[in-house]
Design a protein with these regions (language model features):
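Glycine-centered tight beta-turn/hairpin loop motif at sheet-sheet or coil-to-beta transitions
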Residues: 30, 144-146
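Distinct, well-ordered alpha-helical segments
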Residues: 193-201, 258, 301
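SH3/SH3-like beta-barrel fold
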Residues: 126, 138-143, 151
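Chitinase-like catalytic core of GlcNAc-active glycosidases
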Residues: 179-188, 205, 217-310
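Short, solvent-exposed loop/turn elements at domain surfaces
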Residues: 109-112, 140, 191-198, 218-222
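Primary recognition of N-terminal secretory signal peptides and signal-anchoring hydrophobic helices
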Residues: 1-135, 157, 165-173, 177
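Boundary/entry segment of secreted carbohydrate-active catalytic domains
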Residues: 106-108, 147, 152-199
């Protein structure tokens, strides 16, 4: 297992844990993989070769969340190798150039470059090592069984350079692009009557091809929002060749954006209801205008955007 903080910061930013509702989530292009705390690896249908594996996908101990390497490796383009005695895990890039050499004689791998440095492990003549870095008299190497340390350069021979390619299949996260420059205006809509002003306002606008009416606004901490959406407004805009991106804001001071986005239940409600509202009136897109976000909201906002994009 690896700490969640390490996984999300160094290996795969899409691994997300909702510590309030005890869920691990992973957003794929067409769905969100979900595992409650204690869920066995074998119960996650998106994982392969996990039959009979009852170990949990993730757990929390002493305030730290840990995620199964099996789960992480399934979604991450990295090489993971386990070794025993002592137990250790070696993580490396799946592709790239690697320098390798053969050990000429029995020697020691040392913690630092120097004969007085602590011995990490012994290596025998003929063993293969990967060269990680080279100095004048010593080189940093990784042994076949995953130890990293330094050996003298005169104990190395037959250096080769090998190009490795990854067989990892990255999910395709698609996005919408336009083959023209977007000229967008916002339409401040305070009441449903303001929607009737679209035609007259467009008479004064030149070169505009996208309009974002301020229709949606968070109304409580449960993921609900007010709506001034109007199907006829969208139809009028489309007749004039404009796309309509409905705007949602977080300007209500009685609403905590953190409370809404940090819980999967409320975030899901917001995503589902907002998507349905967009479909109901034929919107071309959604303009998320969440402002004054604090650092603690950041990861949850990113997850919200991931889920909204599914």
């Amino acid at each position: 297992y690896l700490s969640y903080s390490y996984v999300s910061s160094s290996l795969n930013k899409k691994v997300y844990i909702d510590e309030r509702e005890r869920l691990l989530l992973y957003a794929l292009p067409d769905r969100v993989v979900q595992a409650a705390e204690g869920t066995a690896l074998s119960d996650v249908t998106d994982l392969e070769n996990t039959e009979g594996k009852t170990a949990p996908v993730w757990y929390e101990q002493d305030g730290t969340c840990y995620v199964s390497v099996t789960f992480v490796s399934h979604f991450t383009d990295q090489s993971f190798q386990f070794f025993e005695a002592p137990g250790r895990l070696y993580i490396d890039d799946s592709e790239g150039t690697r320098r390798q050499a053969q050990i000429l004689e029995d020697t020691q791998v040392r913690r630092l470059g120097g004969i007085k440095s602590e011995i990490v492990t012994d290596v025998t003549a003929g063993a293969q090592v990967e060269i990680l870095d080279s100095m004048d008299e010593w080189s940093q190497v990784r042994t076949e069984n995953g130890f990293i340390g330094y050996v003298r350069n005169d104990t190395l021979s037959g250096e080769t350079v090998t190009e490795y390619t990854s067989d990892f299949v990255e999910p395709e996260y698609t996005s919408l692009t336009k083959d023209y420059d977007i000229c967008l205006v916002w339409h401040q809509v305070f009441s449903s009557d303001d929607n009737n002003d679209l035609s007259s306002l467009l008479e004064e606008a030149r070169g505009v091809n996208t309009i974002a009416p301020t229709w949606f606004s968070l109304s409580d901490n449960e993921g609900n929002f007010t709506s001034l959406a109007d199907t006829s407004y969208v139809e009028t805009a489309h007749e004039r060749g404009l796309e309509v991106w409905g705007l949602i804001d977080n300007f209500n001071k009685d609403v905590s954006t953190y409370e809404v986005l940090s819980r999967t239940s409320t975030r899901t409600a917001l995503v589902e209801n907002l998507t349905q509202a967009a479909l109901d009136c034929g919107l071309d897109g959604i303009n998320v205008d969440f402002e004054s976000l604090t650092a603690d909201v950041g990861p949850h906002f990113v997850q919200f955007i991931r889920e909204l994009s599914v």
